[in-house]
Amino acid sequence: MKAREVNFDGLVGLTHHYAGLSFGNEASTKHRFQVSNPKLAAKQGLQKMKALADAGFVQAVIPPQERPNVDVLRQLGFSGSDEQVVEKAGTQAPHLLSAASSASSMWVANAATVAPSADTLDGKVHLTVANLNNKFHRATEAVTTERVLRAIFKDDARFSVHEALPQVAMFGDEGAANHNRLGGDYGDPSTQLFIYGRDDSGHVAPSRYPARQTLAASQAVARLNQVNPGQVVFAQQNPQVIDQGVFHNDVIAVSNRQVLFCHEQAFAQQEKLLATLAERVPGFMPIQVPTRAVSVQDAVQTYLFNSQLLSREDGSMLLVLPQESQNHQGVWRYLSELVKGDNPISELKVFDLRESMANGGGPACLRLRVVLTQDEIRAVNPAVLMNDALFNTLNDWVDRYYRDRLTQADLVDPQLLREGREALDALTKILHLGSVYPFQR
């Protein structure tokens, strides 16, 4: 059945700030305590969504989460009114207020893992929410993520949204950032590639930075999503690249249909994996970038692989990149040669996403890929689908509510809490989501 890939992009939240919360993510650490611009961050994301929608790709939006997360601060022993809870946390434990105020839900590649209906035993689209339990500031996202996804994918006859795995290290799950799908047309049954960093049965693991995804989690997600067992491949990410700052697989590899674009050091036992995929995927085309052309360090700094690989109607592909890739002479030289070569990637499109990039999130981090048939697209909440009217409405909404300057010290401002709630209350009406936030319930 004919299907299309829909990119659901995360809208950057009002508390976007730089606090270095994500150990293992070198951009996050490098930009700690710098001044952020939430308004610019949100607009940069919206501009990417609008440009891709204008280019003919189906584009949708996922809203930010309520921050500061007052409920989690109460769980940690701060009491009083909501404003007092924020003030006490900011005074006594600013690092906890910062974590509870993180806008990290913008990176919706970590929101869930998706299985299109062509791959599932029951013929439904399945989405399993990620628990993100390796990082405190992200482990609190799952409950609201589940509510939001249920408000977008409401038709139970077509969609199944599963709650996150148990919040323990054994089942550490980072969502679609560690998942790729390889096949022919989007509507064809395809091979799902689940990538993990850690297997508790004793395989080699990274030593400097944590491996956030476990094999046990990937196996559980494949079961929950009812992926046909004959269409699943599990592969370990190279632990050496995790130790160089490749905290998710989407920092070192991206796939689209029959193409896997990756670094030659991306996976453990890479030759064996590619041979397996060649057996499973008709017309499989790996594009491996050699270290001599682009080092792992340069890939991490430029987010060359944290790109979007999108199919045009004629079968050619567009590679959507952050500006940092264009700014790096060696990386841009490689890419300029790539589009001249004998492969489907025929065009490069560059976006300025520096506000997100400074916290370690590029184009691929900002989007959740969901392959849908036309009937399934019609069953999605239509208010989240990007068009001229929604873009203008959201742009005006950002202008009305967002600050253009934010530091960690500003998070204690009770007005920021009120601004955020007022903004999100308006947003749920724009996107027809109902009461998905704690303050609305």
From Swiss-Prot:
Family: Belongs to the succinylarginine dihydrolase family.
Pfam hit, one: AstB
Function: Catalyzes the hydrolysis of N(2)-succinylarginine into N(2)-succinylornithine, ammonia and CO(2).
A single MF term (Gene Ontology): N-succinylarginine dihydrolase activity
Catalyzed reaction equations: N(2)-succinyl-L-arginine + 2 H2O + 2 H(+) = N(2)-succinyl-L-ornithine + 2 NH4(+) + CO2
SUPFAM superfamilies: Pentein
Name listed for the protein in its UniProt record: N-succinylarginine dihydrolase
GO BP: any one term: arginine catabolic process to succinate
Residues noted as binding substrate in the record, renumbered to the chain: 19-28, 110, 137-138, 212, 250, 359
Entry-linked InterPro entries: AstB_sf (IPR037031), SuccinylArg_d-Hdrlase_AstB (IPR007079)
Summary of subunit composition and partner proteins: Homodimer.
Active site per UniProt: 174, 248, 365 (nucleophile)
